[in-house]
From Swiss-Prot:
General function of this protein: One of the primary rRNA binding proteins, it binds directly to 16S rRNA central domain where it helps coordinate assembly of the platform of the 30S subunit.
Protein name: Small ribosomal subunit protein uS8
InterPro entries named among the record's database cross-references: Ribosomal_uS8, Ribosomal_uS8_CS, Ribosomal_uS8_sf
Protein family: Belongs to the universal ribosomal protein uS8 family.
Entry's Gene Ontology molecular function annotations: rRNA binding; structural constituent of ribosome
Gene3D superfamilies with a match to the protein in the record: 3.30.1370.30, 3.30.1490.10
Record-level GO BP terms: translation
Domain of life: Archaea
Assembly with partners or alone: Part of the 30S ribosomal subunit.
The keyword Ribosomal protein appears for this protein: yes
Alphabetic keyword roster: Ribonucleoprotein, Ribosomal protein, RNA-binding, rRNA-binding
One GO cellular component term noted in the UniProt record for this chain: ribonucleoprotein complex
PROSITE patterns assigned to the protein according to its UniProt record, in alphabetical order: RIBOSOMAL_S8
């Protein structure tokens, strides 16, 4: 069966493994975008680490969970957001101000919404984690 949204599948796999109390989870298929999103999650302390595993079929990521994820998900459709509108989207997807992150694809790469606000740039919303 074809995967329609591999980013949403990966985020729900991570959330379900965290809810089950697992220490690590395998996420497939791997992509550069998913790797960049995992890097942002690691920089913000939501996962302990991740590594790429080449299985000859597109690859996988082995993600070490830190147990700090309450909820995570993909944002679909990927809304374009200006820097001035970041606070509106933060209130839509995060439970409180400065609690959790929005993952944004910008011209400077995939970064958190706080970094995008500091840089003064907008982008497209990819996901949220808190």
């Amino acid at each position: 069966m074809a995967r329609l949204n591999p980013i949403a599948d990966a985020m729900s796999t991570i959330k379900n493994a965290g809810d089950a109390g697992k220490g690590e989870v395998i996420v497939e298929p791997a992509s550069k975008l998913l790797g960049a999103m995992l890097r942002v999650m690691q920089e913000n302390g939501f996962i302990s680490g991740f590594e790429f595993i080449d299985d000859g079929r597109g690859g996988q990521f082995r993600v070490q969970l830190s147990g700090t994820i309450n909820k995570c998900g993909a944002i679909s459709p990927r809304f374009p957001v200006a820097m001035a509108d970041m606070e509106y989207w933060e209130s839509q997807y995060l439970p409180a101000k400065n609690f959790g992150i929005l993952i944004v694809s910008t011209s400077k790469g995939v970064i958190s919404h706080a970094e995008a606000r500091n840089e003064g740039i907008g982008g497209q919303l990819l996901g949220y984690v808190y």
